[in-house]
Amino acid sequence: MVAPSVLGNQDKAMRQKVMADLATLEQALDMYRLDNLRFPSSEQGLAALVKKPTQEPLPRSWRSDGYVRRLPEDPWGTPYQYRMLGEHGRVDVYSLGADGVPGGEGQDADLGNWAL
């Protein structure tokens, strides 16, 4: 009966990684907003934290070294999703879960910054 315990611990570790990544990305987005008086647009996405956007709205005071070194992937190898004017807050940053599609339950459930 070791398998259920190990799988439960793995699920917990994956969820903890998502939450840690989301907290880091949310903090970087807040710093971007402080510097530029707005969040990146949905089109600019999280990439605006790594590389200065070249499309409107252009950032006013983008940090030369960016806001994060690189964008993390969720534990299932999928990029985190970003939506300005989110459904849950000013911005939504989230993982689509193990299945990589919106919605789902258990390991397939979306995990977002609204759960922080």
What is each residue range found by the language model?
Residues 1-6:
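N-terminal single-pass transmembrane signal-anchor helix
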